[in-house]
Amino acid sequence: MARVLRDQLLIDSPVAIEDSASAAWERTTEACGLTAGVMGGLGGARCRTVAAHAVHNGLTQLPACHHVLHGEKVGFGILVQLRLEEHLGDNRLAAQAHRQLKPVLKSLGLPVCLDDLGLANVTASELQTVCEFACQDGSDLHHLPFKVTPDALQDALVGLSERSPVRS
């Protein structure tokens, strides 16, 4: 079901963004609402974008990205989750999904790196705050099939940066 949703988004999202009266927009919104709802409802917390929402929650700790919408932070969080799955879970399919998703998000004007979130000048200490919040006890992040520490999450966040490294 997740692959169907992904494929629908890869196919229809460019047209859907341009024309909210199009059939592509209707298919995209239905796919997001219905498929995500069914998956989350049937599979529970283990079938949701667990790291993506944890990343969103962590990013809320930084005023510099308060202007970024919830869905934009979650979209960025999906890229982070795929990076975690690739590096910590040794998942080559996650690497392929990352390579497919990143250019689509970028073409839609959605954030794909820290700079896009307004965090071009983020410090390592600020990122540590984000990661500790995202990794706190009870976080959905811990539903992943491998352990994610704040340091591992910070590596994934910084690894998505397209420009300069994080300041000390």
Kindly give the residue locations of the regions a language model identified.
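Active-site segments that bind and position negatively charged phosphate/pyrophosphate groups
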Residues: M1-S107
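C-terminal charged capping/lid subdomain of soluble metabolic enzymes
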Residues: D90-S168
